[in-house]
């Protein structure tokens, strides 16, 4: 095994204390960025060749060694040792073992500051696509369920109180719409941070690697960062990514809360599949909504990660500070949580079985059709303020007699208000109430079907992002992009 590599030390008389070394050592989880670090090294090697630091044979040797290192690390044949301070020292140790002093040439003109900034951006651009795929699986499950239930009526709620009847598919698509915006945020994020920090070096820019625009294209970015200080000091790409992930978690948590309620015996609106439920160690009858509960609980962790990271950033002067290393602790936990949650949640949603008859039975309860009374009166030129009062009197009449609107008779109406006629009772039908809500985006069954069709078109755009490459380089197609940049 080769000796550990240290990237600094010439101006020090002694090495770091054991306590400092332990504090400085990167957690093992940080080494997951090895592919991004090696991609950056390949691009930087091209820069050094352009600058005349590497000749053709040296460049080829370094590129070949980097490919071998990537394969060996990926296969588990090479692993960090305790003395490796971080990912950069680990990979340089492996490079030096293969190439000797030639491996040390790769360090010219770059800093760990721009390396780590680049690693994080590349990694997050990849994860934006991978996490999007997980969210899309949930979207597809929601859309399939909604398509099955464009005629299924249920009570809609405000303030957790029965409000108006709605179509179950409409309710499910409301959740799908919020997750769609999260997917669009991932794509927007990617466009905003499609800039390479490589070439910024420590903070002032490199005196050797002077074509960061070319290395940017090698890595799949559209361009290099506009300001070298900002390139190494900025972590708003991390904060925004954490925010998007926390929004995904919150959106899932809201649906999870409903599933917990709806699957309870008090509601019995939905049945959970056995493969996405657990039992009790003492109560044999229990069937618990663990996926929903764990999702709801883990959302708090993700909210805490974005709040904690912003607190770390708030008092940090330019440019790079070691505090910035904390970005990975928050990022990796957030990403790891979502990677566990998303497939489980998609499976749970896709296997839900709704009790259509129970939902229909509950739909008119709690005077959910009261708005139909007010609308019927407005249709007969009664001002809405008065219609509202009359409808309230109708509800009070029913409550005092212990029945819902379905218990009203033609004989009851004149005694409540002379403007109420027997034909009003015909408006108190669930299907009519749904059909009357037929504006754009409303709950009428045909409008829900139209909404689903539009949604599928929008989701296809998100699928194109999730399944697409990172720019034109990074891990493929870099040569053609760089040649085009040289011609420009």
Curated annotation (Swiss-Prot):
Keywords: Amino-acid biosynthesis, Arginine biosynthesis, Cytoplasm, Lyase, Plasmid. Its main location: cytoplasm. Pfam families: ASL_C2 (PF14698), Lyase_1 (PF00206). It is found in: Cytoplasm. GO terms for molecular function: argininosuccinate lyase activity. GO terms for biological process: arginine biosynthetic process via ornithine; L-arginine biosynthetic process. It catalyses: 2-(N(omega)-L-arginino)succinate = fumarate + L-arginine. One of its GO terms (cellular component) is cytosol. Pathway: Amino-acid biosynthesis; L-arginine biosynthesis; L-arginine from L-ornithine and carbamoyl phosphate: step 3/3. It comes from the Bacteria. Its EC number is 4.3.2.1. Belongs to the lyase 1 family. Argininosuccinate lyase subfamily. HAMAP family: Arg_succ_lyase. This is Argininosuccinate lyase 2. The lineage of its organism: Bacteria, Pseudomonadati, Pseudomonadota, Alphaproteobacteria, Hyphomicrobiales.
């Amino acid at each position: 095994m080769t000796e550990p590599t240290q990237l600094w030390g010439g101006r020090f008389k002694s090495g770091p204390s054991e306590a400092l070394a332990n504090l400085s050592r990167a957690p093992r989880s940080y080494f997951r960025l090895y592919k991004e670090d090696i991609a950056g090294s390949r691009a930087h090697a091209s820069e050094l060749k352009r600058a005349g630091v590497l000749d053709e044979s040296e460049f080829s040797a370094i590129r070949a060694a980097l490919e071998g290192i990537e394969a060996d690390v990926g296969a588990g044949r090479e692993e960090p040792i305790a003395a490796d301070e971080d990912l950069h020292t680990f990979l340089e140790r492996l490079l030096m073992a293969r190439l000797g002093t030639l491996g040390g040439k790769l360090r010219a003109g770059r800093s760990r500051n721009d390396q780590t900034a680049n690693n994080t951006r590349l990694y997050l651009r990849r994860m934006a696509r991978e996490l999007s795929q997980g969210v899309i699986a949930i979207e597809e499950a929601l859309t399939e369920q909604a398509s099955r239930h464009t005629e299924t009526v249920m009570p809609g709620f405000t303030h957790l109180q029965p409000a108006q009847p709605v179509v179950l598919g409409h309710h499910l698509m409301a959740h799908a719409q919020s997750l769609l915006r999260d997917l669009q945020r991932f794509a927007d994020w990617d466009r905003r941070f499609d800039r390479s920090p490589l070439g910024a070096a420590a903070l002032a820019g490199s005196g050797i690697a002077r074509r960061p625009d070319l290395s940017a294209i090698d890595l799949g970015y559209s361009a290099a960062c506009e300001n070298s200080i900002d390139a190494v000091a900025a972590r708003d790409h991390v904060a925004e990514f954490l925010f998007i992930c926390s929004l995904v978690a919150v959106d899932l948590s809201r649906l999870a809360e409903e599933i917990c309620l709806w699957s309870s015996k008090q509601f019995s609106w939905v049945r959970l599949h056995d493969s996405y439920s657990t039992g009790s160690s003492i109560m044999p009858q229990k069937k618990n909504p663990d996926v929903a509960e764990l999702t709801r609980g883990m959302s708090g962790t993700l909210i805490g990660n974005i709040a904690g990271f912003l607190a770390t950033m708030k008092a940090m002067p330019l440019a790079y500070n070691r505090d910035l290393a904390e970005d990975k602790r928050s990022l990796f936990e957030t990403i790891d949580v979502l990677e566990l949650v998303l497939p489980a949640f998609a499976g749970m949603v896709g296997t839900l079985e709704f009790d259509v008859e129970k939902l229909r039975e509950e739909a008119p309860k709690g005077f959910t059709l009261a708005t139909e009374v007010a609308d019927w009166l407005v249709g007969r030129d009664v001002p809405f303020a008065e219609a509202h009062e009359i409808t309230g009197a109708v509800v009070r009449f029913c409550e005092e007699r212990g029945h819902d609107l379905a218990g009203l008779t033609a004989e009851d109406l004149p005694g409540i208000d002379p403007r109420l006629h027997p034909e009003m009772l015909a408006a108190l039908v669930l299907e009519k109430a749904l059909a009357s809500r037929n504006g754009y985006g409303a709950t009428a069954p045909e409008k829900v079907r139209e909404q689903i069709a539009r949604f599928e078109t929008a989701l296809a755009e998100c699928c194109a992002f999730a399944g697409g490459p990172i720019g034109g380089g990074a891990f493929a197609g870099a040569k053609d992009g760089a040649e085009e940049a040289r011609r420009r």
